[in-house]
């Protein structure tokens, strides 16, 4: 029996490559999967790793009427040619264009997976435009999937769509491979030995080695942040908290993993502090964050807004408790007092900055320093809570069951 054709769309190939790793190969067992995105150099990686056909479509993330109309026409022609049973999209611009084009091409099933809602951090006219884009995308979709319960509630509260909404499994776009995201596997991969032979002593020695290479001592309490080093990830508040804590606790350290971007760039004084403070170690972007998570004692993730963030899940799978803000996704992954701590969110429902979270962040980070037994208890809970809810295979099977319900 011929397999139904399924087209998965993201705006750029970096999302197709990073967000959907392994999932497309899994789905290709049951459907004829095509990946569609703008090729910025990673589309061939997707093609080879996932074993699927990929098509380059010149879509841009930012609003550009001429380029958007051109991309819309290309998508329409592609869908008319390929005649897919379903077009399933995520990322804002790719979703907007592909849902309209799929509707015009009479694709039977048009699925929009809503991850982050960009308008939540915007104001004025831009906020209105971004909300309108979400409404249009949802209106042209036959099915809308919120990535988590927080996104679901926001879509309803902001009257983005009246369509029925249901989160797949416990949420998240791709789940986590907890076999790969484990201390034992990390040591095995880096020492080139079988994970079955890795002992607790091997893991302790490896952690100590990585800490030493990063300039940390056994007495240091190391917080780690992973992500874009930008304002809406809470970098201003995190730098202020670290300044205060460094005066009180000379052995507190911050390990920063990620890129410093020009868009939403941090202020000069924050930039200088994060690069020059002896209490901060900046290592830039890393292809494998597992050794850095092993070197840390806790994740700090004071983001302003998310859809369903991957970093707290990765940290949890690596046995780290987390400090997060009370925002979509983060407050689903973390259960306050069980596998981390939740502090107030800086933005209200209209994207206005209503709370300076610096005092709460400082207080909570200091609580971690003062309560090693509680931190250890939350650490023991962390991995189990990720495995129970976000194991990758469970997320994939949940998505497959959703697809089959539409056949």
Where do the model's predicted regions map?
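N-terminal strand-loop element at the rim of the active site
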Residues: 8-67, 154-158, 165-167
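A conserved mid-protein helix/loop that constitutes part of the nucleotide-sugar donor-binding site
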Residues: 17-22, 221-244
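Short, structured helix-loop element that forms part of the nucleotide-activated donor/catalytic region
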Residues: 43-48, 253-279, 283, 374
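Donor nucleotide-sugar binding/catalytic pocket of nucleotide-sugar-dependent glycosyltransferases
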Residues: 55-56, 135, 139-207
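Short His-centered aromatic/hydrophobic patch
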Residues: 89-95
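A short, well-ordered alpha-helix in the C-terminal region of glycosyltransferases
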Residues: 209-212, 367, 374-389, 395-400
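Aromatic "clamp/platform" in nucleotide-sugar-dependent glycosyltransferases that forms part
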Residues: 285, 304
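Short hydrophobic beta-strand element within catalytic cores of glycosyltransferases
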Residues: 321-324, 334, 342
């Amino acid at each position: 029996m011929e397999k139904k054709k399924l087209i998965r769309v993201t705006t750029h190939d970096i999302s197709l490559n990073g967000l959907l790793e392994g999932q497309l190969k899994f789905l290709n067992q049951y459907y004829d999967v095509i990946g569609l995105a703008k090729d910025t150099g990673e589309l061939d990686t997707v093609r080879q790793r996932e074993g699927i056909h990929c098509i380059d479509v010149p879509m841009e993330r930012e609003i550009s009427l001429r380029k958007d109309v051109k991309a819309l026409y290309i998508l329409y022609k592609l869908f008319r040619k390929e005649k897919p049973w379903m077009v399933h999209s995520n990322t804002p611009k790719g979703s907007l264009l592909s849902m309209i084009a799929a509707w015009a091409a009479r694709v039977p099933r048009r699925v929009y997976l809503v991850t982050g809602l960009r308008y939540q951090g915007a104001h004025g006219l831009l906020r209105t435009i971004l909300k309108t884009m979400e409404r249009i995308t949802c209106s042209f979709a036959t099915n809308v999937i919120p990535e988590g319960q927080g996104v679901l509630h926001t879509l309803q509260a902001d009257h983005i769509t009246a369509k029925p909404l249901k989160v797949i499994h416990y949420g998240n776009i791709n789940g986590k491979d907890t076999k790969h995201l484990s201390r034992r596997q990390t040591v095995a991969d880096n020492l080139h030995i079988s994970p079955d032979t890795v002992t607790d002593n091997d893991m302790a020695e490896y952690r100590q080695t990585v800490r030493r290479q990063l300039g940390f001592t056994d007495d240091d309490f190391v917080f780690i942040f992973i992500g874009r080093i930008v304002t809406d990830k809470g970098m201003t508040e995190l730098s202020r908290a670290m300044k205060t804590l460094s005066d009180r606790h000379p052995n507190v350290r911050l390990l920063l993993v990620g890129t410093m971007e020009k868009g939403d760039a941090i202020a000069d004084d924050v930039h200088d502090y994060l690069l020059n403070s002896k209490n901060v170690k900046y290592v830039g972007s890393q292809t494998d964050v597992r050794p850095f998570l092993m070197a840390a004692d806790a994740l700090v993730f004071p983001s302003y807004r998310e859809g369903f963030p991957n970093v707290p899940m990765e940290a949890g799978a690596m046995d780290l408790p987390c400090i997060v803000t009370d925002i979509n996704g983060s407050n689903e992954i973390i259960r306050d007092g069980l596998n981390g701590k939740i502090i107030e969110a800086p933005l209200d429902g209209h994207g206005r900055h209503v709370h300076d979270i610096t005092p709460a962040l400082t207080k909570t980070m200091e609580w971690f320093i003062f309560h090693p037994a509680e931190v250890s208890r939350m650490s023991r809970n962390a991995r189990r809570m990720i495995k129970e809810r976000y194991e990758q295979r469970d997320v994939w099977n949940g998505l497959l069951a959703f697809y089959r319900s539409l056949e």
